[in-house]
Regions:
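Conserved small/polar residues in nucleotide/adenosyl-binding loops
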Residues: 169-171
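Membrane-embedded hairpin module used as a gating/binding unit in multi-pass transport
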Residues: 120-132, 148-161
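Short, ordered loop/turn segments at secondary-structure junctions
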Residues: 18-20, 44, 67, 96-97, ...
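Short glycine/threonine-rich loop/turn motifs
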Residues: 95-96, 119-122, 139-151
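Metallocofactor- and cofactor-centric catalytic cores in central/energy metabolism, strongly enriched
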Residues: 1-57, 71, 81-84, 92, ...
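Phosphate/pyrophosphate-binding betaalpha-module
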Residues: 63, 67-129
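Short glycine-rich or small-residue beta-strand-to-loop segments that form or flank ligand, phosphate
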Residues: 12-17, 59-65, 115-117, 144
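Short, surface-exposed amphipathic charged segments that create phosphate/polyanion-binding patches used
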Residues: 53-60, 104-109, 131-132, 155-161
Length: 172
């Protein structure tokens, strides 16, 4: 859907850089840009508001992809656009929540022994949802930050829990 918009006249797709190489049904955004799609990188969704103000003749399509951490910024961006009366911004959403994704994995992928949970999402949702998953699926869920020492500590914690056949939620 993003590529379809990016190929339309007077439409530009805005996306974060990590989405450029993700394969889609017709190729990646990077591939499609080489075939004429109008795709621009953004560092913040609020850039869409600035661009839409400066170029009202263009429809700015924001690829709103992410989890609990990114959804609020898209909502605030749209609120700002509405308050300013900007009508040339569209969202293509693929926003998910972590817990249903983990639940699906637990129900469909039985060969996973434990989970490293995202610290940035956990700041928003807390640790209780992971505690419930640990009890329900009898697997350890450990929250980690992005630093190497956090990840190593979490791996150590997971290995210890798996060895002892424990299933708890921990934070590194």
């Amino acid at each position: 859907q993003c590529i379809r918009y990016a190929m339309q006249e007077n439409h530009v797709l805005l996306t974060f850089g990590d989405m450029m190489k993700v394969p889609g049904t017709e190729g990646s955004l990077s591939d499609m840009k080489g075939k004429g799609a109008k795709v621009e990188l953004m560092y913040s969704p609020f850039e869409a508001v600035e661009k839409a103000e400066r170029h009202p003749d263009i429809t700015w399509v924001v690829a709103a992809v992410g989890f609990e951490t990114t959804a609020p910024s898209y909502a605030l961006m749209m609120q700002q656009a509405v308050e300013k009366g900007i009508r040339n911004i569209r969202l293509v959403t693929a926003l998910k929540t972590v817990i249903p994704a983990l639940r699906w994995i637990c129900e469909n992928q039985m060969d996973i022994d434990g989970f490293i949970c995202p610290g940035h999402v956990s700041v928003i949702i807390g640790s209780k949802p992971y505690e419930a998953l640990a009890r329900e699926y009898k697997k350890p869920f450990v929250i980690a930050g992005f630093e190497a020492e956090h990840i190593l500590a979490v791996i150590y914690d997971l290995v210890r829990q798996i060895e002892k056949k424990r299933s708890e939620e921990h934070t590194s």
